Amino acid sequence: MSENQQALNHVVSMEDLTVDQVMKLIKRGIEFKNGAQIPYEDHPIVSNLFFEDSTRTHKSFEVAEIKLGLERLDFDVKTSSVNKGETLYDTILTLSALGVDVCVIRHPEVDYYRELIASPTITTSIINGGDGSGQHPSQSLLDLMTIYEEFGHFEGLKVAIAGDLDHSRVAKSNMQILKRLGSELFFAGPEEWRSQEFADYGKFVTIDEIIDQVDVMMFLRVQHERHDSGAVFSKEDYHAQHGLTQERYDRLKETAILMHPAPINRDVEIADHLVEAPKSRIVQQMTNGVFVRMAILESVLASRNAN
């Protein structure tokens, strides 16, 4: 069993993945996009547990599982024993005892997965579909796949991440891996939403200072549900100060691309008519989410088979 397989018993944080593992997942995602197939004759079982709302992550994991021919065990939080007070640990312990091979989990608690992967009793592999404002590895990997398809490399690329930085698991996951891959990072958005941890990975700027220099302009959703009611800007003020207006779009380099993890607050982070503009890769990101999640599932299942 290779070191790479051993490390991918779980995929919970970009910090836990080596650059080599990341590149293998990206390239495997591209292979799946180009038509590669893998038949699973032993019918591994995957359960998706989403304790927070999701469309893209939840449904693209489901499509990835269907394309791989995996067995899906539906889990509805609303009708489960969670509503009787059952803990997440006991829920996963139960699914593990039932023979579920992989659990894809989104949960509001940061680092929820640490207790699960440390348990000697839980044998199910964990894929983190997002933990509060912590990590979102599969989103980061699909973003990387989209950038790699465009440029063929990461070294030397100027990447700006703009918006609700503090509350964004996407920003944290991407900044950690992009710095290791050799990209130059810039962070823009309201000063109230910039924690000092970002300074270790890049430079704080205003969007107008950097918009005409970057190769990748990545906007983040304003996460109203994670803010105190008094902390939210008006939509109009936010868009004027920090969003992608037509004037800012026109200043982007000829080769620059526009990204957003979605869902998008139209006319807040990005002007409505620019969401599908020629430089936008937002739809491509969604498409790539299926294929990179196929690669993640394949790698985790390969590790289980090797054990």
From Swiss-Prot:
GO terms for biological process, alphabetical: 'de novo' pyrimidine nucleobase biosynthetic process; 'de novo' UMP biosynthetic process; amino acid metabolic process
This enzyme's EC code(s): 2.1.3.2
Major enzyme class: transferase
Keywords: Pyrimidine biosynthesis, Transferase
Binding positions (carbamoyl phosphate): 56-57, 106, 136, 139, 262-263
Span of the signal peptide: none
GO cellular component: cytosol
Matching InterPro entries: Asp/Orn_carbamoyltranf_P-bd, Asp/Orn_carbamoylTrfase, Asp/Orn_carbamoylTrfase_sf, Asp_carbamoyltransf, Asp_carbamoyltransf_Asp/Orn-bd
Annotated catalysed reactions: carbamoyl phosphate + L-aspartate = N-carbamoyl-L-aspartate + phosphate + H(+)
Involved pathway(s): Pyrimidine metabolism; UMP biosynthesis via de novo pathway; (S)-dihydroorotate from bicarbonate: step 2/3
Pfam families to which the protein is assigned, alphabetical: OTCace (PF00185), OTCace_N (PF02729)
Gene3D superfamilies noted in UniProt: Aspartate/ornithine carbamoyltransferase
UniProt-annotated binding residues for L-aspartate: 84, 169, 221
GO MF terms held by the record: amino acid binding; aspartate carbamoyltransferase activity
Oligomer and partners: Heterododecamer (2C3:3R2) of six catalytic PyrB chains organized as two trimers (C3), and six regulatory PyrI chains organized as three dimers (R2).
HAMAP family from the UniProt entry: Asp_carb_tr
Family per similarity comment: Belongs to the aspartate/ornithine carbamoyltransferase superfamily. ATCase family.
Function, as annotated: Catalyzes the condensation of carbamoyl phosphate and aspartate to form carbamoyl aspartate and inorganic phosphate, the committed step in the de novo pyrimidine nucleotide biosynthesis pathway.
Protein name: Aspartate carbamoyltransferase catalytic subunit
Source species of the chain: Streptococcus pneumoniae serotype 2 (strain D39 / NCTC 7466)
Highest classification ranks of the organism: Bacteria, Bacillati, Bacillota, Bacilli, Lactobacillales
